[in-house]
A protein has these predicted regions:
Chain C
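Amide-donor transfer/coupling interface in amidating biosynthetic enzymes
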Residues: 73-77, 105-239
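N-terminal beta1-alpha1 cap of cysteine-dependent amidohydrolase-like domains
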Residues: 1-84, 93-99, 103-110, 118, ...
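Glycine-rich nucleotide phosphate-binding loop and flanking beta-alpha elements
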Residues: 52-53, 89-91, 147, 171
Length: 83, 771, 239, 83
């Protein structure tokens, strides 16, 4: 089976997120003062070959721990779908 | 469609399965007119296949064929003892001391940047780097010349920010220092920004390689990135077939990958210096088509390519798409067959593929197969050479003449004091630090003078000598008087080079104009080129290549004619380089050159009077030449502490810039100068803000002044001993006609260094508005 | 004789600059390819600046897994000096040879300019010739230079005196921004506990040639040239 | 009401994605040859004040069209949650 996995890697809460701040500023200047708490991170999308959804998820978790996210500064979230 | 000529069929080719038949409408879509199509029929003796039509349309496009500009470009001086390679190759090459040579070239990426500023600018830098390393030269500097609409419009801010980021990210990643550039803002560029990138590379003259295919049976290899459906003639094609297959919008934007470029750079130089290959050319505009056809034509041979062998990014690409793709970071290499494995080993070390895709033939035919089926077969030399050449009508536009003879309305109060502050606050004159701080200017550890002064200077590693590099064009002068404006662009470039102590060697040019089929545009083009040619002859700086970019039109009309001049100069001893800022209290300030007070086309009239007009001061080529020689000679004897040319904003701005110092000193210097006795009968405002050429503000240690004055006399250059450099953080005091003008240097610095950042606080806002 | 290995990753672009700076102080230097599994007996390692693997994903994240990095890890564990400059510093953090991380500059844009820094720690393999507190002007050129670390890590770095370089605050008149990237505690460079592994965001190798200007970066390389292995040299003293 | 919106901005299909390529390469070298079709984009997270979920979505769509996504090179996807 092949699974399509969506990963979101976000700056850890509490860390300064200058990109998020800049976007929030820009949104407000553009007439969207109703947007707040903006944070910007990375979205990664990949196919993974696995026997089961659980295995796919476990596999991508390993990838995140090893490479896709920096444990010092980032948190990640997965969503596994069929592909 | 049938052919009216009864000529015999020259070659045979079959349509690729599924390909549309070639109809009148399809021919028009390919931007080929009747004369051109007639010539294609005659040259083939039959109707072309769609693939062939695509090939013709690419090679006979303005960009590849120079069909409107060739006769004019042929009037440029291109010879000289220093010329190793003139126009016609990927880059020009000039000789340096000790077996070294410099390869350099400038190229525009205006239209891609108007659509997608970041990627457009980034891929523009990528392309020009490849043009230089494909000659066997290692890129050692990049420069950029940019034009945008005014910064009070959000769309212009968005384009400016995106372009600067794109230029920076690409060059920074590859590791080439940006040593200079220019940025200008004027309403005419609003719908059509200009993005010109220049690259300068160093090579041993013996390593020079030319992009000519030789040796029947030699292999063609595709090296580097895979081929995708990028940039397949976005503008000219609205192919039904393509839009049926694609979901929403077709990906036409080329995305740059500077990391792959860096690997390609290292691999290419290794292939060239190890002698493993016969020829190499980058796949730039019109991709595989132009690179293979041009290499074959230069070598007087034929080529046969199998598009089925080209590594692609997506499945199911047609020969048409593969031939016309403008995917970035690819090279076409010609090599002897027994070298292929070794070449692949070198490329693999740099994590790149190298796939054989064809070979050199002896029949002179440009032949394309796709897994056996011949889909294109065209006589190669005629494909490259036979595009009809046009001699468009040229007539000066009414309004240009009217603007030149117009006189400005004097504002109610002329505030000579406040004018300097206004000028330094104009984004056109203000410090471009906001731009060049985004560019790595010190990587390669050879930067002697970075951006922020006149020309940039780098040391040639392992030698005592250096190169000075600059790009310049005052588009306002060209718009008002194309001939004098063309001369002025070359003169300013040469002056910038000379200010560092270097001797101008040669130029490359990027000719940005509107639609050449409009007589008033072609007039600008022809006259500007005549000016460039005359100036280059006077300075012994031959034209070694360049680029023509026509059809730069916004809804409001053609852009200002902007022939950007990229120049390199030789600094015999790097240790003699002259910075542009004052550095030592007590030094004497000397003005070199004569002031007549020309205000036509000046920044003063533009920014203070809100008037663009008048007749620009004529360029005195002999005076410029004398001044250049004087500067080189004075620098070589160590007589100069600083030299800065007076251009936009005149003497007042030049003096202020020299006094303010660079952005990183704690403070500038005060300066006192008496301009009273300097220019008899010239009104104060014209002394302060007039823009005559051939003038430089210098400072010298008191002990060197006599020698400098007598040297200037020997060169026939007028000198005015104007005053002295004062203490740190002092004031700029200019005395003339019994009046004293005083500006605090700290206050001027704040204006000058914050003018652009103040306007760019929210650069990325409002991408769409105001488009 | 001392030898230095300058590691080349695909995308390194300050490798030649580093090699030349080392040779300028009379020390032998050679390139080591990222696929190599040994350092070929080098005494000192430099991870140069650049954009290893394009700096895609995160600066230094992919380079950290290059085969040569295992040899670098062993070398560091054995007390061998390692200097990471710019991208090299980012790689050292990703490889956990130094604590913390280097994130996107607070101003978001790439920053290339000279900055003033103070040398705080001189008990390292690369700063031993400096007087503590000396001010240098060094170029920076980076997009990801904002040093961050957990609160307790920062406290530990300060308490142990492991801040090697710190950006100098601006003066009123000078438009020179003190901290070009928003680094915590204005940190421009740090070291490991023993001072053998050092990471710097500024580029000393670009200002090591007097011909190009004031050679404020030269001291890092004369320090390197003066470094001696702690134990084994006792039997074979260098002249 | 306040809604928490997750936006994923991804490079448009067919466009070169050098980051995705590099990550795929690295994953494979790290012992994850089972990952393929990797693409890297941006993840943006924000709070938006709106009357209804539909209004929140419409609002964020406007933000995407105007600022958050580049219409020439990127596609975006929204997920609206309560906050
Ligand atoms: N786009 C740019 N990129 C890099 N440097 C730039 C750019 N624009 C301007 N500069 C630098 O800023 C300085 C001033 O530019 P400019 O006013 O055009 O100088 P000049 O009038 O002497 O030609 C020069 O050193 C120039 O190289
Ligand atoms: Mg100048």
């Amino acid at each position: 089976m092949s699974y399509r996995v969506q990963v979101r890697v976000m700056p850890r809460g509490g860390l300064l997120d200058p990109q998020g701040q800049a976007v929030e500023h820009a949104l407000s200047a553009l007439g969207f003062p109703d947007a707040s708490a903006v944070r910007v991170g990375r979205a990664i999308e990949l196919e993974v070959a696995a026997e089961s959804r659980r295995e796919a998820e476990a596999r991508v978790r390993q990838m995140c721990d090893k490479l896709l996210a920096n444990p010092v500064t980032e948190d990640y979230l997965l969503e596994v779908g069929e592909s | 469609m049938t052919s009216s000529t009864a000529a015999a069929v020259v070659t045979a080719a079959s349509p690729f399965p599924g390909e549309r038949p070639v109809t009148d409408a399809v021919v028009r879509e390919h931007n080929l007119n009747e004369v051109e199509y007639g010539r294609i029929l005659e040259l083939l003796g039959r109707t072309p296949t769609l693939t062939e039509l695509g090939v013709f349309s690419a090679l006979w496009s303005e960009h590849c064929s120079y069909k409107h500009s060739k006769p004019v470009l042929q009037t440029f001086p291109t010879a000289g003892p220093q010329v190793v390679q003139g126009p016609g190759e990927n880059a020009g090459v000039l000789r340096l001391p000790d077996g070294w040579a410099v390869a350099f070239k400038i190229e525009s990426h205006n239209h891609p940047s108007a659509v997608e500023p970041y990627q457009g600018a980034a891929t523009g830098v990528g392309g020009i780097l490849r043009d230089v390393f494909t000659m066997g030269a290692r890129p050692v500097a990049v420069l950029n010349s940019l034009r945008f609409g005014p910064l009070d419009q959000p769309r212009n801010r968005y384009l400016f920010a995106g372009v600067v980021r794109g230029v920076g990210d690409y060059g920074n990643c590859v590791g080439i220092p940006t040593l200079g550039g220019e940025v200008g803002f004027a309403p005419g560029y609003t719908g059509n920004p200009l993005v010109n990138a220049m690259c300068v590379g160093l090579l041993r003259e013996s390593d020079l390689i030319r992009a000519a295919a030789h040796g029947v049976g030699n292999v063609l290899l595709c090296v580097g990135a895979r081929t995708g459906r990028d940039g397949i003639h976005g503008a000219s094609f609205a192919s039904e077939e393509l839009s049926e297959r694609s979901e929403a919008r077709r990906p036409q934007v080329q995305v740059g990958d500077p990391f792959t470029e860096k690997l390609l750079l290292e691999a290419s130089l290794e292939l060239i210096t190890s002698g493993l290959i016969v020829a190499i050319q980058d796949m730039g505009a019109a991709g595989l088509t132009s690179s293979s056809a041009e290499m074959a034509a230069r070598g007087g041979v034929g080529v046969e390519i199998d598009t089925g062998l080209v590594p692609t990014r997506e499945a199911g690409m047609t020969p048409y798409e593969i031939l016309l793709s403008e995917s970035q970071e690819r090279m076409l290499v010609v090599a002897e067959p027994y070298r292929v494995e070794e070449i692949q080993r070198v490329c693999a070390k740099w994590e790149l593929g190298a796939e054989p895709i064809g070979h050199v033939t002896d029949d002179g035919i440009f032949r394309v197969r796709h897994h056996g089926l011949v889909v294109a077969a065209i006589p190669g030399q005629r494909l490259v050479d036979d595009c009809p050449i046009y001699q468009p009508a040229a007539r000066e536009g009414e309004d240009a003449r009217a603007r030149r003879t117009a006189k400005p309305q004097r504002p109610a109060r002329t505030d000579l004091q406040g004018a300097l502050e206004l000028l330094l606050d104009s984004p056109n004159l203000a410090s471009k630090r906001w731009v060049y701080e985004q560019y790595d200017s010190t990587v390669q550890a050879s930067t002697v003078l970075g951006p922020g002064g006149d020309a940039g200077v780098l040391q040639v590693p392992g030698t005592a000598f250096g190169l000075a590099v600059t790009v310049d064009c005052n588009n306002r002068l060209v718009a008002l008087d194309p001939y004098e404006g063309g001369k002025a662009a070359v003169a300013e470039a040469a002056r910038n080079i000379a200010c560092t102590g270097a001797v101008p060697l040669g130029i490359t040019d990027c000719l940005n104009f509107g639609n050449p089929e409009k007589p008033e545009v072609f007039f600008q083009f022809r006259e500007a080129c005549r000016g460039i040619a005359d100036a280059c002859r006077a300075f012994d700086t031959p034209v070694t290549g360049g680029n023509v970019s026509f059809y730069n039109e916004s809804p409001a009309g053609a852009v200002d004619p902007t022939p950007t001049i990229g120049m390199v100069g030789l600094l015999a001893r790097v240790a003699d380089r002259v910075p542009s800022h004052f550095s030592t209290p007590g030094d004497e300030i000397l003005l070199l050159g004569a002031t007549r007070g020309g205000l036509g086309g000046s920044a003063y009239w533009t920014e203070v009077f809100d008037f663009i007009g008048g007749s620009p001061a004529p360029v005195d080529l002999a005076a410029e030449r004398s001044l250049q020689r004087l500067l080189a000679s004075a620098a070589g004897r160590g007589l100069l502490r600083s030299a800065h040319d007076a251009s936009e904003g005149g003497l007042a701005v030049a003096l202020a810039e020299a006094a303010m110092g660079d952005a990183y000193v704690e403070s500038g210097f005060g300066a006192v100068a008496d301009l009273g006795a300097y220019a008899d009968g010239v009104p104060a405002e014209a002394i302060l803000y007039g823009e005559d050429g051939a003038r430089v503000v210098t400072s010298a240690a008191p002990s060197n002044v006599d020698a400098l004055v007598s040297l200037a006399g020997e060169h026939g250059v007028p000198v005015h001993r104007a005053g002295r450099v004062g203490e740190r953080g002092g004031a700029l005091e200019l005395r003339l006609g019994g009046r004293l003008f005083t500006w605090s240097i700290g206050a001027l610095r704040r204006i000058y260094y914050t003018a652009i950042p103040r306007r760019m606080r929210h650069p990325d806002v409002d991408r769409s508005a105001g488009a | 004789m001392l030898t230095v290995a300058v590691v080349r990753f695909p995308g390194s672009n300050c490798d030649v600059d580093a090699l030349r700076a080392v040779e300028r102080v009379g020390v032998m230097a050679q390139f080591v390819w990222h696929r190599d599994t040994s350092l070929h007996g080098a005494d000192i390692v430099i991870l140069p600046g650049g954009f290893s693997y394009g700096d895609y994903l995160r600066s230094g994240a992919i380079a950290r897994f290059s085969p040569v990095m295992q040899a670098v890890q062993r070398h560091a564990a054995d007390g061998g000096p390692v200097l990471g400059i710019c991208n090299g510093f980012q790689i050292l953090c990703e490889a956990h040879l130094l604590p913390g991380a280097l994130l996107r500059n607070a101003g978001l844009a790439f920053v290339s300019k000279p900055v003033d820094v103070v040398v705080e720690r001189t008990a390292t393999a690369f700063t031993s010739v400096f007087e503590p507190g000396v001010r240098l002007r060094l170029p920076v050129a980076h997009g990801d230079g904002r040093f961050v670390a957990a609160e307790d890590t920062l406290r530990m770095l300060e308490a142990e005196g492991r801040v090697v370089l710190r950006y100098v605050p601006a003066t009123e008149e000078s438009p020179l921004q003190p901290n070009p990237n928003g680094s915590a505690n204005h940190i421009a460079g740090i070291s490991n506990a023993t001072g053998t592994v050092v990471g710097l965001m500024p580029h000393p190798e670009r200002v090591a040639d007097p011909l190009l200007g004031v050679p404020d970066g030269l001291g890092f390389f004369t320090s390197l040239a003066a470094w001696r292995p702690p134990v084994s040299t006792l039997s074979t003293p260098n002249p």
